Each structure stands twice: as structure tokens, then as C-alpha cells.
């Protein structure tokens, strides 16, 4: 699959057919626990699907805010971008491909599938982590089907935990078992609140960023996930010019993770 097709498929996937089990609106936001009023709210923004284009990744490096980049394994620029992004002071995660409900969407190389046995799951996780050795955590790429498979997600998270990595459930399914399983394994973990760019319309992305800000104020912190689109960069730039955002700092994902 070429880079353009990959990015287009990723965008369309998030636009509805990804879930297969829930309404489109529930893909956008997930409510967390009410925040402690004595804690200052924070926003952590993850940029997914990194690894297929140098320019698309680099456009985020000059935003002058802490960002976390989730890098796909076995992509043309996986290793190069992991090093470059880390050198800029940003955090790096492994973007672990997992099976979606819609079989027309290819999660890409190094993916995990329903029915995979423990040996295959552990082997793939080991190989993918070795592809992104600077990773401090993992989140799922696609995975609306795989994250609903209790045995398989348990094996995957156990393998991730053995490397002392945290896990962020991207919540591509409202029935995902990933976060609950991670908690039972006593892993450092959390889950996505808002996908900011399921639509590439800049005004819609800006609206999602404001939604992310509201989540942070209400729950103490919020985790957003975006993708390497030019529209996403421009919307973030516009969002940062809003004086009302200055009281809610962007932080790296590690700053909001908890056990």
C-alpha cells in the first residue's frame, strides 16, 4: 500500500465503518473520571500513523508544544523518524496495528488478528518493539475487532508490559477490552478522549480541539489523537493562537499516564 492510500484509508476508517458496533458520534469522545479540582488540567496530543512520510511528520515538529508521535512498525521511515522526533525532544510510541472490523481496511505489516495464538502475538510484539526502540509506550492502530478479543488482547498487553511500556487504548471500539485488561494487569495505561481529525475540515478539527480542552477542564486531563494531515497542523496552529488555551498546557503523554 502506498503512503497516500494508507493515509486516506486511515481517515475513512475513523469516519464510521471502523466501529461497526456503535454510532459515529461515540467515536469522537470518551468520558473519564471527574477531575480533582486541585489539579491543573493538561492536554496530551498523540499524532498517529507516523512512518510513511518524512514531510508529513516534520510539519508537526515546529509547533512549539510537547507532542507524542505514534510510529507504525515496518514502514519506510519508522526508524529514521523515531530518532529524529526523539532528538526534537518529543516522545515516541509504537503504533501497534490490529485487526479492524472492516476487512477492506488493511492494518498494515506487523498486525495482530483475532485467533492469533500467544506465540504469534508475542513474536509480533517483540519484533515491532525492536523496530521502534525509543518507544516509551504503545497504542493501537485500527483494532476495533482485535481489542474486543479478550484472550488475544490479554496476550498482547502482557507482552507489552514485559517491556515496561505503558498502553493507551485508542478506543476504536466502544466495546474495547484493552483498557480494562490493562488495568487488571496493573499496567500504566489510559484511553483516548477525542479523535480530533476524523474529518479533515479545519473548522471541524478546531471544534474537536475545543472539545478536548473542555474534557481536560472537566476531568483533569484529556488525551487527543490526530493524524499527519496538513489540515490538522493548521488547525492546531490556529487553536494555539486562542488566548483561552494558555491556561491548559500541552504535555507529553507520559505526564498524564497512571496505573
What are these regions (language model features)?
Residues 71-72, 97, 247-259:
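A generic structural motif
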Residues 41-43, 65-67, 88-90, 133-136, ...:
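Short, well-ordered coil/turn segments that N-cap beta-strands
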Residues 36-104:
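Active-site beta->alpha N-cap acidic-glycine motif
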Residues 118-209, 215, 227-249, 256:
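Catalytic domains of cell-wall/extracellular-matrix polysaccharide-remodeling enzymes
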Residues 1-22, 26:
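N-terminal secretory signal peptides and thylakoid transit peptides that target proteins
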Residues 43-47, 67-69, 92-94, 167-169, ...:
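Hydrophobic faces of well-ordered beta-strands that scaffold small-molecule active sites
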Residues 21-42:
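C-terminal segment of N-terminal export signals and the immediately downstream linker at the start
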Residues 88-134:
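Substrate-binding cleft of extracellular glycoside hydrolase catalytic domains
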Amino acid at each position: 500500500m502506498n503512503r497516500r492510500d494508507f493515509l486516506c484509508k486511515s481517515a475513512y476508517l475513523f469516519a464510521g465503518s471502523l466501529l461497526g458496533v456503535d454510532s459515529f458520534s461515540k467515536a469522537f469522545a470518551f468520558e473519564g473520571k471527574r477531575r480533582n479540582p486541585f489539579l491543573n488540567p493538561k492536554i496530551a496530543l498523540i499524532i498517529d500513523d507516523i512512518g510513511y512520510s518524512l514531510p508529513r511528520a516534520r510539519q508537526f515538529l515546529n509547533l512549539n508544544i510537547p507532542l507524542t508521535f505514534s510510529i507504525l512498525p515496518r514502514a519506510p521511515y519508522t526508524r529514521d523518524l523515531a530518532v529524529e522526533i526523539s532528538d526534537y525532544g518529543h516522545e515516541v510510541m509504537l503504533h501497534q496495528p490490529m485487526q479492524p472490523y472492516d476487512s477492506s481496511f488493511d492494518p498494515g505489516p506487523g498486525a495482530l488478528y483475532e485467533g492469533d495464538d500467544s506465540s504469534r502475538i508475542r513474536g509480533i510484539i517483540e519484533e515491532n518493539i525492536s523496530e521502534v526502540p525509543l518507544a516509551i509506550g504503545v497504542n493501537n492502530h485500527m483494532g476495533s475487532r482485535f481489542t474486543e478479543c479478550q484472550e488475544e488482547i490479554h496476550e498482547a498487553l502482557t507482552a507489552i508490559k514485559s517491556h515496561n511500556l505503558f498502553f493507551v487504548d485508542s478506543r476504536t471500539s466502544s466495546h474495547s477490552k484493552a483498557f480494562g485488561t490493562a488495568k487488571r494487569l496493573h499496567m500504566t495505561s489510559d484511553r483516548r478522549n477525542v479523535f480530533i481529525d476524523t474529518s479533515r475540515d479545519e473548522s471541524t478539527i478546531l471544534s474537536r480541539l475545543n472539545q478536548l480542552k473542555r474534557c481536560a477542564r472537566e476531568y483533569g486531563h484529556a488525551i487527543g489523537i490526530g493524524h499527519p494531515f496538513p489540515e490538522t497542523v493548521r488547525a492546531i496552529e490556529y487553536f494555539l493562537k486562542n488566548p483561552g488555551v494558555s491556561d491548559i498546557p500541552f504535555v507529553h503523554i507520559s505526564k498524564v499516564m497512571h496505573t
